[in-house]
Amino acid sequence: MLESMPGMGSGYMHGMIPYYRTKLPVFYAIETRDWKSAAALEPVAGSPPEVSTLVYWARAVAHGHLRQSEQARADLARYDELLVEIRKGKRAYIAEGTFTKIEHAEMLGWVAFAEGKQDEAFTNMRTVADLQDKVGQAEVDIPAREMLADMLLESGHAQQALSEYEIALKLSPNRLNGLYNAGRAAEAAGERSKAQFYYATLMKSTNNGQNSTRPELTHARRFVSVTQSAAN
């Protein structure tokens, strides 16, 4: 796609090419929750260190979900090495920025989660979620509070997860993963009316999932249909 845009071939926009070649695959893998693909991401050739950090952030998140602690810790170590490189360059301020601190704290949370240190993981992620709620997100950031909810749900704390998803959705409304997993958490917590609400909202926001084969939408559609049939 980028090769078809000749205006990006020189000047400032040329320098943005590694950024977009990195960012698009990273967020596609994370948003589709394709953890194996996210864990296999590699920096784009020629990327500056401040761009490559995004790859290792995504890998740490993925390895956290996959419970691959050694790999998650290696991702964190490489991220830290890149921060050292950034501090030596002309854009050293990036290493001390709030969004970098949020990314780094999220990685610490996922490393702890992968290592089975649930309480530490929850504490780290709750702290960073509170910070992010105050300062706001970058344009396509994954809400840290949604990550906290993911951890709680994957650890069997459905009711707590539901509460965190609900807070996340107030700040980042209509996110597919937020709505779907709020529905999952509600189901697991035995709150079928809330599950129905979140799944129905998901169906509405995706045009009933007509143009998608994602299993999340299939599950939500089936749940809504069964619940509506039972009510009639």
Regions of interest found by a model, annotated:
Residues 2-15, 41-50, 80-96, 129-137, ...:
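Solenoid-like repeat scaffolds
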